[in-house]
A protein has these predicted regions:
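Acetyl-CoA-dependent GNAT
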Residues: 28-86, 97-98, 103, 159-160
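A short beta-loop-alpha structural element at the N-terminal edge
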Residues: 2-15
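Short hydrophobic/aromatic beta-strand or adjacent loop that forms the aromatic wall/cage
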Residues: 48, 151-155
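Conserved acetyl-CoA-binding loop-helix of GNAT-fold acetyltransferases
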Residues: 89-104, 126-130
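Conserved GNAT acetyl-CoA-binding A-motif
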Residues: 104-117
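Conserved catalytic-core motifs of GNAT/GCN5-like acyltransferases
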Residues: 115-117, 129-151
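Helix-loop element at the rim of GNAT/NAT acetyltransferase active sites that forms part
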Residues: 17-33
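Hydrophobic adenine-recognition pocket in adenosine-nucleotide-binding enzymes
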Residues: 7, 83, 117
Length: 160
């Protein structure tokens, strides 16, 4: 069973490792450089909320929510999701997504927007569309893959 709870200081190494594995994989995150634990701590501290997915006392995923834009755009949330590579296609991403939508509502956000969903990331595209996100645009070649191929990215939005 997957439990989703607030991120705790003891989770920092696990969340850093999750993030860095996805960066290294090179298929979905814009970041190219791994983060130190201190850099991840700083990143998490700058977010409005961070949660982790835990199974058998092991952190297997996480997400963090922040304002998509400052000031007059701060009523729209954005979030980043990390699911351990060995825990994909097991419902972890969906559980994190559903939890994040509920959390964003509680925090008073009016919508959720994702600015860079790689169009070839079929599980992610399927997840967001199944959760009633609408694709509001495409940026042709907006993601430079590790093989130097340029892939399209989609912008998704859902009212809360």
């Amino acid at each position: 069973m997957i439990t989703i709870r607030d991120h705790l200081p003891d989770d920092l190494l696990a969340t850093t490792n999750l993030f860095n594995a996805i960066v290294s994989d090179g298929a979905s995150f814009m970041s190219e450089e791994a983060l130190s634990v201190a850099a991840m701590a700083s990143k998490i501290a700058s977010m409005r909320y961070t949660a982790v997915a835990v199974k058998n006392n092991v952190v297997i995923g996480c997400y963090w929510i922040h304002d998509n834009m400052p000031g007059r755009g701060s009523h729209i949330a954005n979030a980043t999701y990390c699911v351990g590579l060995s825990h994909r296609n097991q419902g972890v991403g969906r559980a994190l997504a559903e939890h994040s939508l509920a959390s964003a509502r509680i925090m008073g956000y009016r919508g959720m927007q994702f600015d860079g969903v790689v169009c070839t990331n079929a599980p992610s595209v399927h997840l967001w569309e199944s959760l009633d996100f609408i694709r509001v645009g495409i940026i042709p070649g907006g993601f430079r893959a590790t093989n130097e191929q340029y892939l399209d990215i989609a912008i998704y939005y859902r009212a809360l």
